[in-house]
Amino acid sequence: MRFYLKKALVGNLKKLGSGMAVTALSMSLCAGVLSGCDKGTGTDSNAGSSGNMQVGESSADDLKPETENPESEGESITQFPVIERKAADEIEINPEKIDVTTFSLPDGPEESGIFVQPIADISDDFIRGMDASAVLAVENSGAKYYGFDGEEQDVFKTLAEAGVNYIRLRVWNDPYDENGNGYGGGNNDVATAIELGKRATQYGMKVCIDFHYSDFWADPTKQYVPKAWKGMNLEQKSDALYDFTVTSLTDILNAGVDVCMVQVGNEINKGMSGETFMSSVAELLKAGSSAVREVSKAAGKDIQVAVHYTDIDKQGEVAKITADLDKYGVDYDIFAMSYYSFWHGSMENMQEMAEYVQDTYGKKVVIAETSYCYTTEDGDGSGNSVSGDGDLVDGYDATVQGQADMLRDICAAADEADIMGVFYWEGTWIPVGPADADNSSIWEKYGSGWASSYSGSYDPKDAGKYYGGCSWDNQAMFDFTGHPLDSLKVFRELKYGATAPLAVEKVPDVEVSCNVGAELALPETAQVVYNDKTANREVPVVWDAEQTAAIDTNIGGSYQVEGILQDEELDEEYR
């Protein structure tokens, strides 16, 4: 996951007279043409700013992501002890017993606060996943989570009740500075993964461990080498990575965590652990995969190995990546993709990429990360990565219903393409203080913001400059006070759907254009969008006569005209 901070924009429904809401007609007249105001494309304008170079046998100077930590320059050469790789018969797995409580999926449609279209043939084994890595830091900061009954309870119980069957947890090698201060973002070390993983296992959910093989965020813009591995050559680093994987995974399994999938690397399009040449990255991947295989054998369970990439919308990216993995003999079971609809193109393209991997290489595919906002508001005063109309995808509003629709539709597209399932990214990352409060001391102390100032010693170019609070709270599936949203129930409602009283979701603004000097024809109807999209309809509209008369099509400009919907069946606020 990468972060982009943007100023939030909040749109409000306009009202006319006696509290009645209206639809609005937005127009602009410029460069000789009367046209609708720009609504944005639903894509992130910064998504390509980190560069598009493919990992491969190119010069390291040509690669865009940060790989070696800046502060490491000029350090003396360190002598590293030789690491002997443990085989399965040298690994001791004696899992702690955890009493497990499970929750069944419904056997028919449910009544809910949202409408969910059923996916008739979806399997109960379809991965309904949630990345919940920041939970412990959020809780340590004083925030609380609640169940659907409004009572405080373990967030993992709430997730399981909502149909989540898989939890994804990131692991950083050493996310602390020399004084033990956490870098933030959840301070996700192995001990944190163990504590959260045990709680997930307690409620019957499988666990995916996401090794970043870095001390902090690893994504296409940066893949910093862990501090302890600085100065290592490739062979030493491969051995260290193997040992870290074996030791960490063994500790997690022995704690009783039901690990069933392991990611070796996170969004590694541009490199991993400071390596950028694909031949070198492949050696690290093979070391990580081999470590998982040996631990899996020692544990007597089938732990799947996943490799994780993003930017699947870029032409040729997936084909080049998978060809390189095959060329260098990387052993893996699952091709994991990040798919954020506001950054990574259409669902149809996502399906095509998945089917290409399946058909060409016989690998399974999972969506390792996705999300969508339920509001454009900011919950903690620190700004959000996704906010405003320009970040939204056509047809999916920033509402609880819009979030539910997006998750349901991504799951439907994934199921149609024989994808294993979907992990929602950080749906539990909520604010730890109100937006109008100074929460910085809490973020610094407990690591509940995306980065703390202490991370600057490790990542001075990004986190060290732009540290702060949670940039994802408006995409969580809990509100700003920790109460679950109805959209969280989509996981349990995928197969049979959910019904809700028919309600208007929005009345979108209408946009028209005409040439300068031409006659302007205003539309006679406006669309009314419902929570059940099959009920959407066109309704007659009367535009404000005074505002309409003020339009001069002989002069370039922009105009906004309010209109009244003519339908007695609509609630008064929408007429």
Task: Give the positions of each predicted feature.
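Gram-positive cell-envelope targeting signals
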Residues: M1-S76, M130
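N-terminal carbohydrate-binding accessory modules
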Residues: F80-V164
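Aromatic-rich peripheral "rim/lid" segments of glycoside hydrolase catalytic domains that contact
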Residues: I114, E377-V386, L392, D397-D405, ...
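Aromatic-lined substrate-binding rim segments of carbohydrate-active enzymes
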Residues: E151-A218, M278-I303, Q351-A354, Q358-T360
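Glycoside hydrolase catalytic-domain groove-lining segments
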Residues: D154-F156, A298-Q304, A319-D391, R408-I419
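Active-site cleft segment of glycoside hydrolase catalytic domains centered on the general acid/base Glu
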Residues: G182-Y183, N187-T192, A218-L325, V330, ...
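Solvent-exposed, low-complexity, repeat-rich "mucin-like" stalks and linkers
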Residues: P501-T534
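Serine/threonine-rich, repeat-prone extracellular segments and beta-strand-based repeat modules
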Residues: D532-Y574
